[in-house]
């Protein structure tokens, strides 16, 4: 039995107080188009078993960006490595993204409990404000009187992606620039988060 460090109420968010999100990575390059980042997490860090080694590769491929994660450990453990970037396709300091047009290849999303922890139950998006199977602006339904949205003060939900293998998951367009971003993944879900708890004065980089 293992006890991990709680840092958000009773929950352990982002692997606790010493997760990879708080780690300074070693950096290297492969050729002119690939950045390789590596870091280690010793056995027992914040209660997690196993010596874990993480490699993250950022590669430019034509007009696209590929992110690959590889984590190895010497003991059974829990790992869910992801990317926590934010995108405003209208450009830096261009205001809200609520006018961005979004579509998701997701017929369902995961229900969460009062602590925003998934219960494992899939809820169909059809007929609800959670439905992005047809393109719409992010802001169209974000303030709808719907329990899942009110609980999170917006979108902060794992959408269940149809099919398997490497496939398209999301299409996002900035209305002012016309810039369109498409995302692909091999994973079963994608998290839609509308920065509900970030302060407006949060500093950003160009």
Show which residues each predicted segment covers.
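An exposed, glycine/acidic-rich loop-and-rim segment of catalytic or binding clefts
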Residues: 1-206
């Amino acid at each position: 039995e293992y006890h991990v460090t709680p840092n958000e109420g009773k929950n352990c968010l982002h692997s606790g107080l010493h997760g990879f999100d708080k780690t300074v990575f070693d950096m290297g390059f492969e050729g002119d188009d690939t950045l390789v980042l590596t870091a280690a997490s010793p056995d027992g860090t914040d209660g997690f078993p196993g010596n874990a080694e993480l490699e993250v590769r950022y590669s430019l491929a034509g007009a696209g960006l590929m992110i690959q994660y590889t984590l190895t450990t010497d003991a059974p453990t829990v790992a869910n490595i992801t990317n926590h970037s934010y995108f405003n396709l209208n450009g830096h300091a261009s205001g809200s993204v609520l006018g961005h047009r979004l579509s998701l290849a997701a017929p369902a999303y995961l229900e969460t409990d009062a602590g925003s922890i998934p219960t494992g139950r899939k809820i169909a998006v059809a007929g609800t404000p959670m439905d992005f199977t047809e393109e719409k602006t992010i802001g169209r339904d974000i303030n709808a009187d719907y329990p899942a949205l009110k609980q999170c003060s917006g979108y902060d939900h794992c959408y269940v992606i149809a099919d398997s293998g490497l496939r398209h998951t999301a299409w996002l367009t900035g209305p002012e620039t016309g810039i369109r971003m498409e995302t692909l993944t091999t994973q079963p879900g994608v998290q839609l988060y509308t920065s509900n708890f970030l302060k407006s004065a949060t500093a950003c980089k160009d």
